[in-house]
A protein has these predicted regions:
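Eukaryotic partner-binding/assembly regions in large regulatory complexes
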Residues: 1-90, 171-185, 189-293
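Short acidic, hydrophobic short linear motifs in intrinsically disordered regions
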Residues: 24-39, 113-141, 247, 322-349
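Positively charged, polyanion-binding regions of nucleic-acid-associated proteins
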Residues: 25, 96-118, 305-324
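Short amphipathic alpha-helical interaction segments
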Residues: 42-53, 144-162, 350-364
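A short, conserved structural fragment
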Residues: 58-62, 155-157, 161-172, 276-280, ...
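Basic, short loop/linker segments at the boundary and entry of helix-turn-helix/winged-helix-like folds
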Residues: 76-102, 294-306
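Internal, well-ordered domain-core segments that constitute the primary functional module
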Residues: 106-186
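Hydrophobic multi-pass inner-membrane translocation pores used for secretion
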Residues: 225-410
Length: 410
């Protein structure tokens, strides 16, 4: 029996819409050229429908023109430090505070600059701006004379290249780092203009404390009616369901938990319809799981030495009945090295490496919502139970642990 043309077209439309939505969630800045060109075309084709969905359900604005599609995402939890920018060319090292400051100074310099700029010229402008007494008072200084400072700037430039803000015309960053040459870039001004994802310009924020400034940047309109308060909760919860590996009930306020209890089916169904993510509801919380295992920047388990160590420590932590000291985990890694070291890299077996291995593992587990950290210990969260060795104890019907997946975001 032949399928009616209308059904075929509806199915094609739904598939394109889902692919575009997933692409925007994974890469919120899509360019007309490059590896996401196909996804950009779909996002632009369905921009009106996507714009309405994201605005209603998350409060994220979508802008699309002939050069780029930009989903202005903001995180559901502003204080989450587990998703830093990374220098993918150097072991995925997370950005430090210094690199973030350099990034902001570089963006400011590019905004004022011409259509082309050399890396050396960009560095000179950053040094001048960094001399501002207000910045110096924070303890951040840049002379860009030392190799480590130039490496930091090169990492920032590589991020801007990856985002499409810059296009390399000639030269290599390594030549600049070593002092043997310079690099020339085209500045994509429309892409640059779309990077800022705040609801208001930072220059209009007058609060002094960091937390207050951050809150002002993303603040919505005054919640002076039940309708507006419910809308704010719907948007906040949907953002967290889309971005966070697990939404734990005990992280919510009483009002948020009450709203989620009443609207859970509606919220999760809307997300599933658009993205294909599937809700797994358990006693402790909800995880929107991706059957395609694509909408995530962190996986568990992962390949390689660090992935193996992380999995082994997850099994160890799942059996804990309270906080576990970091020193205890380091001791456990030394024990594991004697059993499994033959499968690890040579550097991981060197004396003293257990501290770094623990730090890497705990960072990944925290980013996946499996543990939380204190300065000297690790606290297990319910979803880690899926990595326990042996039978999982079910506390009540439906309380099996939820599988974690950290959604990609930027």
């Amino acid at each position: 029996m032949t399928t009616p043309l209308a059904e075929v077209l509806d199915g094609q439309h739904a598939a394109e819409l889902r692919k575009a939505a997933r692409a925007l969630l994974k890469q919120p800045l899509l360019l007309a050229r490059g590896r996401y060109a196909e996804e950009f075309r779909l996002a632009r084709r369905h921009a009106s429908e996507l714009r309405e969905w994201f605005d209603r359900n998350t409060g994220w604005a979508l802008q699309a023109d002939t050069e780029a599609a930009r989903l202005r995402k903001s995180p559901g939890v502003l204080t989450d430090p587990t998703h830093p920018a990374r220098d993918t060319t150097r072991g995925a090292a997370p950005f430090t505070r210094r690199r973030y400051v350099l990034l902001c100074l570089a963006l400011a310099a590019l905004e004022r600059g011409e259509a082309q700029i050399a890396l050396g010229r960009l560095a000179d402008q950053i040094v001048l701006d960094a001399a501002d007494p207000r910045l110096a008072a924070t303890g951040i200084e840049f002379a860009l004379e030392r190799r480590d400072e130039r490496l930091d700037l090169a990492a920032v430039v590589r991020l801007l290249l990856d985002l499409g803000v810059l296009r390399r015309v000639a030269g290599e960053e390594e030549a600049y780092v070593s002092g043997a040459g310079d690099v020339l870039y085209d500045v994509e001004r429309r892409v640059l203009a779309g990077l800022l994802a705040s609801r208001r310009g930072p220059s209009t924020v007058h609060a002094e404390a960091f937390d207050d400034r951050l809150a002002e940047l993303v603040a919505e309109t005054a919640m002076d009616s039940d309708e507006l308060r419910f809308r704010a909760m719907r948007r906040s919860l949907t953002r967290r369901l889309l971005d966070d590996p697990v939404l734990y009930y005990d992280d919510l306020s009483d009002a948020e938990l009450g709203y989620l209890t009443r609207q859970r089916g509606f919220l999760t169904a809307r997300i599933t319809e658009l993205t294909g993510l599937v809700a797994e509801v358990r006693a402790e919380g909800i995880a929107m799981v991706d059957p395609e295992d694509d909408l995530t920047d962190l996986r568990m388990p992962e390949q390689g030495t660090y992935g193996h160590v992380t999995l082994l420590l997850a099994e160890h932590l799942a059996a804990a009945d309270g906080p576990v000291d970091l020193d205890e985990l380091a001791l456990r890694v030394r024990e594991l090295a004697s059993q499994h070291g033959g499968f690890w890299s040579k550097s991981a077996r060197e004396p003293g490496m257990e501290t770094e291995l623990v730090a890497q593992a705990v960072a990944r587990l925290a980013a996946l919502g499996l543990v939380s950290r204190t300065p000297y210990a690790v606290v297990v969260r319910p979803a880690l139970a899926r990595y326990a060795v042996g039978e999982t104890v079910i506390r009540e019907p439906g309380s099996a642990p939820v599988p974690p997946q950290r959604k990609a975001t930027s």
